[in-house]
């Protein structure tokens, strides 16, 4: 690890599986190194995968197989901006279809418990519109969604 700042994500023995899935699912993502434990440790044995260096959409990450003590929470999430409904659907379906869990307003958790937000750019533009009534309509439409539907957001924006 030579980067000055890297996100460290804690896993219970599944860091390589998660990193590989992210690399296969998101553009500009790759698994760059796998480090095996030089000796036994509380949640593993010598030779087990201890850490995995990977990049998710250009963001450097380190997956640490630290054991079952700590879990991911919604306090941390990756937000992915999408350009169209097809991209939104592809990413949403990839994560949810691989054991993920849907939540509200474009949020979901992957099968490892990590939270993600799939946020179409049109939504960000809509809720920050200088027309505050239109922004409110778009916001209220989003509040009733799980996966964001761009056509519904655009219709709400127009009134």
Q: At which residue positions do the language-model features occur?
A:
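Extracellular/periplasmic catalytic domains that process cell-envelope and extracellular macromolecules
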Residues: 1, 44-48, 55-56, 70-72, ...
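Hydrophobic faces of well-ordered beta-strands that scaffold small-molecule active sites
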Residues: 5-7
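Core segments of cupin and vicinal oxygen chelate
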Residues: 9-58
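A charge-rich, low-complexity, intrinsically flexible signal that marks solvent-exposed coils, linkers
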Residues: 41-43, 74-76, 159
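C-terminal cap/linker of serine protease catalytic domains
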Residues: 130-159
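Extracytoplasmic/secreted envelope proteins and their assembly/folding machinery
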Residues: 19, 89-92, 139
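Vicinal oxygen chelate
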Residues: 11, 25, 56-60, 71-72, ...
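Aromatic/hydrophobic pocket-lining residues that form the small-molecule binding cavity
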Residues: 15, 88, 135
